[in-house]
């Protein structure tokens, strides 16, 4: 009986958040262990189904860098990185699109549909809803920077109660162009801004932003982030994550979250509890 009462209490505790977030758009950047570990995949799908069922509108943007590198190595195609960004040659671009749009995207869509969601996979090339330009063609090849997002494509899918799953491939306005490989974090932040999402949530392999003692920092502002960058507290791979958060905030997203995707049901714990489990980034 005690366990049953606890279940009821958990539902009651979540109710204010369910009411608050009903009909709101949440953009979720899906990556890291949550995307590769089978048990975590199942928990992620359950979380998305629950969000979907209670009236929240999840939009998923996924990465796939590890699998891209794995396939490139298998095919003996050289791949290099500059400042953490992949150099995308024409040969690499072909594999990037194959893996992101043709492999990982469909795997996620199938996973969600098998759990009862109504998911549909798209890339920025579909209806040219994401267009881009070269970041620096001489240096990065077909690695791109987003120029424009047409939010109506995703809004139409949401209106029809689909869960959009977006592969970070952008179109070019040039006929016959292979398109652009887009950093998934930055793609997610741009999509969130274009959709005027309530939240953007990044699933990572870290608890969030940590201080110099390794303790979780639960709340950050742009001013605090700049200070922590200067003193080296925020460094390495966390820099592009917080930059993506700030870009989303600047585009009008209310809150950005960096959470540990290795924790089962991390999305629900962050969204439906007062304390959350990760770092939230606020405007101002």
Curated annotation (Swiss-Prot):
GO terms for molecular function: acetylglutamate kinase activity; ATP binding. Pathway: Amino-acid biosynthesis; L-arginine biosynthesis; N(2)-acetyl-L-ornithine from L-glutamate: step 2/4. It comes from the Bacteria. The keyword Endoplasmic reticulum does not apply. Substrate binds at residues 64-65, 86, 181. It catalyses: N-acetyl-L-glutamate + ATP = N-acetyl-L-glutamyl 5-phosphate + ADP. SUPFAM superfamilies: Carbamate kinase-like. The record marks 29, 241 as: Transition state stabilizer. It is found in: Cytoplasm. It is an enzyme of class 2 (transferase). Catalyzes the ATP-dependent phosphorylation of N-acetyl-L-glutamate. This is Acetylglutamate kinase. It comes from Nitratiruptor sp. (strain SB155-2). The gene is argB.
């Amino acid at each position: 009986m005690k366990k049953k009462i606890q279940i009821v209490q958990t539902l009651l505790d979540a109710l204010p958040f369910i009411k608050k977030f009903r009909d709101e758009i949440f953009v979720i950047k899906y990556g890291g262990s949550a995307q590769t570990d089978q048990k975590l995949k199942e928990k992620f799908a359950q979380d998305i189904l629950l969000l979907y069922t209670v009236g929240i509108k999840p939009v998923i943007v996924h990465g796939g860098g590890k699998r891209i590198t794995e396939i490139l190595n298998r095919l003996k195609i050289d791949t290099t990185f500059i400042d953490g960004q992949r150099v995308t040659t024409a040969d690499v671009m072909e594999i990037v699109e194959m893996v992101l749009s043709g492999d990982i995207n469909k795997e996620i869509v199938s996973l969600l549909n098998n759990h009862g969601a109504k998911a549909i996979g798209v890339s920025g090339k579909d209806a040219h809803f994401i267009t881009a330009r070269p970041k620096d063609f001489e240096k990065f090849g077909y690695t791109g920077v987003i120029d424009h997002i047409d939010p109506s494509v995703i809004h139409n899918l949401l209106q029809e109660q689909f869960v959009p799953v977006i592969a970070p491939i952008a179109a070019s306005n040039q006929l016959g162009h292979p398109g652009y490989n887009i950093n998934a974090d930055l793609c997610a932040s741009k999509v969130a801004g274009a959709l005027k999402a309530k939240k953007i949530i990044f699933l990572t392999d870290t608890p969030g932003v940590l201080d110099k003692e390794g303790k979780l920092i639960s709340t950050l502002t742009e001013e605090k982030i700049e200070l922590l960058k200067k003193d080296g507290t925020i460094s390495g791979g966390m820099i592009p994550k917080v930059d993506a958060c700030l870009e989303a905030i600047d585009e009008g997203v209310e809150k950005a979250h960096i959470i540990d995707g290795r924790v089962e049901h991390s999305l629900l714990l962050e969204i439906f509890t007062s304390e959350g489990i990760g770092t939230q980034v606020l405007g101002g």
